[in-house]
Amino acid sequence: MARTGYSATIEGENVARAKANELPVSPKHSIEIARFIKNMTTTEAKAYLTDVVALKKAIPFKRFNRNVAHKRGLSKWPAGRYPVKAAEAYIRLLESVEKNAEYIGLDVENLRIDHAAANTGRGLRAFFPRAMGRATPKRRETVNIEIVVTEVA
C-alpha cells in the first residue's frame, strides 16, 4: 500500500487529525457523511451518527441522490438515507481523532471538525466462477477517510 498524505494542509498547535485507509465502505455514502459532519463538533457528530446507526435520523443525500426517497426528519433537504456501515466507520474515526487530540493536550469537548473528506481507495478485484468455464469480474470498493479537527476556545 502506498503512503498517502492528507488532502488538506491545516497546521497549528491546536490541530489533531486521523485517517483510515481502504475501508470496505461505500465511497458515495462516505462522501455524503463527510459533507454533512463538516463544521460540527465531534460530540454532535458522534451523537448524530449513533442515531443514524440506530435508524432514527437520516443523512441528507445532496450529490448521490438519484432514486433516493424522502426521509422524515430532514429539514432543508428531503432526500436521504441511513448509511449504517459508513456511519460506524466515521464513529471509529471520530473516536480516534479525539484520542489523538487528548494525547497532544487539547480539550476534547471543544473540538470542531474543520476538514472531513472521503476518497475512493484501491479496488480489490476477484472473479465469480460461472458455468461453461466462464468468469465474471467483481470489484470491491474501498474508501480512504480523513478528519482534521481544531480546538475552539
Curated annotation (Swiss-Prot):
Matches recorded under Gene3D superfamilies: Ribosomal protein L22/L17
Keyword Amino-acid biosynthesis: no
Protein name as it appears in the record: Large ribosomal subunit protein uL22
Family: Belongs to the universal ribosomal protein uL22 family.
Quaternary organization: Part of the 50S ribosomal subunit.
One annotated GO molecular function: rRNA binding
Species of provenance: Methanoculleus marisnigri (strain ATCC 35101 / DSM 1498 / JR1)
Role summary: This protein binds specifically to 23S rRNA. It makes multiple contacts with different domains of the 23S rRNA in the assembled 50S subunit and ribosome.
Biological process per Gene Ontology, one example term: cytoplasmic translation
Pfam families: Ribosomal_L22
GO cellular component terms attached to this protein's record: cytosolic large ribosomal subunit
